[in-house]
From Swiss-Prot:
UniProt KW keywords: Cell membrane, Membrane, Protein transport, Translocation, Transmembrane, Transmembrane helix, Transport
Membrane spanning stretches: 30-50
Gene name tied to this protein: secE
GO MF annotation terms: protein transmembrane transporter activity
One BP annotation, GO: protein targeting
InterPro entries attached to this UniProt entry: Prot_translocase_SecE_dom_sf (IPR023391), Translocase_Sec61-g (IPR008158), Translocase_SecE/Sec61-g (IPR001901)
Organism field: Haloquadratum walsbyi (strain DSM 16790 / HBSQ001)
This protein's record includes keyword Protein transport: yes
Membrane protein topology class: Single-pass membrane protein
Name assigned to this protein: Protein translocase subunit SecE
Similarity section: Belongs to the SecE/SEC61-gamma family.
Species lineage: Archaea, Methanobacteriati, Methanobacteriota, Stenosarchaea group, Halobacteria
SUPFAM superfamilies reported for this sequence: Preprotein translocase SecE subunit
Subunit structure: Component of the Sec protein translocase complex. Heterotrimer consisting of SecY (alpha), SecG (beta) and SecE (gamma) subunits. The heterotrimers can form oligomers, although 1 heterotrimer is thought to be able to translocate proteins. Interacts with the ribosome. May interact with SecDF, and other proteins may be involved.
SS bond list: none
Amino acid sequence: MDVKIELSSYVRVLKLASTPSWNEFSQIGLIAGAGIVFVGFLGFLIFAIMTLLPGGV
């Protein structure tokens, strides 16, 4: 395993990477938040259906 080659590839990737703008950052935050809310709502919906059905948990 050649550590020097691996480190140079990591450095190359870090040089290409850039800090996201505020618009990109807020858009990513909104999309991630919407996904979290959706998964939570889906879990609550499944829980509510299982509770209302006879023989549910």
